[in-house]
Amino acid sequence: KNNLTPGGDSPRAMELSATLNIPVQLIYDKPFLNALAEALDEQQEATKNSDLDVNSIIKETAHCREKANDFKAVLLTGATGFLGVHILKELTEKNVDIYCLVRNEERFNNQLKYYFNKIDLSRVKTVIGDIEKENLGLSESRYKDLAERIDTVLHVAANVHHAGDYADLERTNVFGTKNVIAFCKDADAVLQHTSTVSVHGAATVKQRYGKNILDESILDIGQRYEDNVYIRSKYCAEQEVLAARLDGLKTNIYRIGNLTWRTGDGRFQKNSVDNGYLHRVHAILKLGMVNENMDKYPTDLTAVNECAKAFVNLAFTGDTNEIYHLYNPNFLKTEDMFKRLDVPYRIVSTQETIETVFANADDRDIHVYMFYMIISGRSRNIEMKNEYTVAKLRETGFKWSEPTREY
């Protein structure tokens, strides 16, 4: 009788989220009033109990930076993903042996065929395993043999769903990262860990206090990362990496931006139907309007092939204990993007947007747009900085391209 979203009513959940000023995911997870109240209490308690001073760790270990030895063999996780498969392509141009940890070799081969007409696999070996399992799902002898070979691990595997059961994301993004860390310690290998710029929480979660800038020297800016399952899992994964760094493991963290299609041929991710950014763009085109909250958040268009090249360039400098922000710094506001495309649209109030969206709630693009619109209204804009990363990339001969009208 206290069910807040009878029949799994998503628009109702979104409306409650905006009215009660609480995460929409929490309403999905705890649709009954008593359970919702208990969950809110637990979140507050979890916030109090977070005692790892991540910012101090970043500052302290930054003074311990040192060059790693030349890499001869690398282990790549997530090679079947959109970014991972492009990182693999970049690795094939390096003088290294490449071991790809995959759960399914057939899917791995299918991904290669989908993204590339030609790729040199002469130094690529597949290892059937699973980061979610102890010893990466390998036999003791296989694990030991691999640990003796590997110099660095490029950990790209992740669950990137922004809503769902936290246990699923935690299993991959947190526990999986812990298993990769354990392997790196056993192998005395450098960990190259992919994270996300979304750890800042802008347009997604509230802030506890008012730090409005996220650069490469900080993680905790007061964001209530617990309010979103994806951000929470990636924030906690960074905590694990930083704790390992404090314990002596050489690590780098790469916070990835809004990955978009390749330059040149426009090839995009295979599962583009799940891409939230495309849903938002499609919704704006259908509605002919942009909510006033969302228009203030500029977007980066980070071409996946450029991101992969930047990642590998930085990994192979040998620098360790770094944090990098891998996104194209040539930001676009929604207004600027649609002006370039000569697409007419209006900036409207939240109330007008809600009324229009509810009238079209059966449309998936508009449904997703509503989700992002509501959560963006609860968060302040966070200024992202990556000047340090851009300078380091410049040293490797890399420069981000300007998004053109054609792109």
Language model region names:
Residues K1-C64:
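Phosphopantetheine-dependent thiolation modules in NRPS/PKS and related acyl-activating systems
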Residues W261-Y277, L314-Y324:
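Glycine/proline-rich active-site loop of Rossmann-fold NAD(P)-dependent oxidoreductases
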Residues L154-H155, A163, A167-R171, F175-V229, ...:
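Conserved Rossmann-fold NAD(P)-dependent oxidoreductase catalytic core, especially the SDR/UDP-sugar
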Residues D120, V124-F175, K185:
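NAD(P)H-binding glycine-rich loop region in Rossmannoid oxidoreductase-like domains
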Residues A310-M373:
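Mid/C-terminal beta-alpha module of Rossmann-like enzyme folds, strongest
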Residues I221-Y225, N271, N275-E306, A310-L314:
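A conserved pocket-lining segment of Rossmann-fold NAD(P)-dependent short-chain dehydrogenase/reductase
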Residues K67-K94:
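N-terminal Rossmann NAD(P)H-binding glycine-rich loop of SDR-like oxidoreductase domains
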Residues E238-F268:
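Conserved beta-loop-beta element that borders a ligand/cofactor-binding pocket
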